[in-house]
Amino acid sequence: EARGRVEPFTEEQLQSFSDIYANEEIRGATPRYWEDVQVGDQLPRMMKGPMTVTGFICYAQGWGGLYIRANKLAWKMQQAHPGLGIKNRFNVPDCPERVHWDEAFALEVGAPGAYDYGPERNSWLTHHMTNWIGDDGFLHKTNCQIRRHNPDGDALFIDGTVTRRFVEDGKLLVEISQKAETHRGELSAMGTAIVELPSRAGK
């Protein structure tokens, strides 16, 4: 049984998501100078999703996954680590990571459905930052807190606010507070980042 919260998006919602993607601001080669940034400045909104199982698998393909193996490689891993596999509906030991694409297993472990990888959300917050700082900026420090699952069907919006502008050890730094919420307004992740920006004075 599905989790009981599948709400199909309207065409208008999908168009609004498309507009956010089409207008995503990527600073790139245009420097963002430290002198031009002020406390209270809002970063452009970034969107991720709507989440799909296909998207979850794409992320797993990109980073490899800890236990995702097939055929003889899966067998070899089970031989080396007999307690690793969790039996599926065919009584076959399978990897615990299948909570990200196996709806029934995700529900069995108490999740709201097949859901995204937590580390991917960390990468989304850093993506939000690198879009904003541009090629001449440097992501000095980042912190991310994962607050809930993002099951398939969720859309996520990432916003940020400049909270501090300061100089430390000769570096021109800016601190950003970030927040990622679903299309229902649920807090999914939050974080902070400290970035180094270039100066108009060329220092």
Language model: regions and residue ranges:
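HotDog/MaoC-like acyl-thioester-processing domains
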Residues: E1-E24, A29-W34, Q38, N150-K203
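Hot-dog-fold acyl-thioester-processing enzymes
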Residues: A2-D136, R200-K203
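Short structured motifs
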Residues: T30, K141-R147
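Hydrophobic residues on conserved beta-strands that form the core of alpha/beta folds
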Residues: R45, L139-K141, M190
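Short amphipathic alpha-helical patches
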Residues: W63, P82-G83, R148-L156
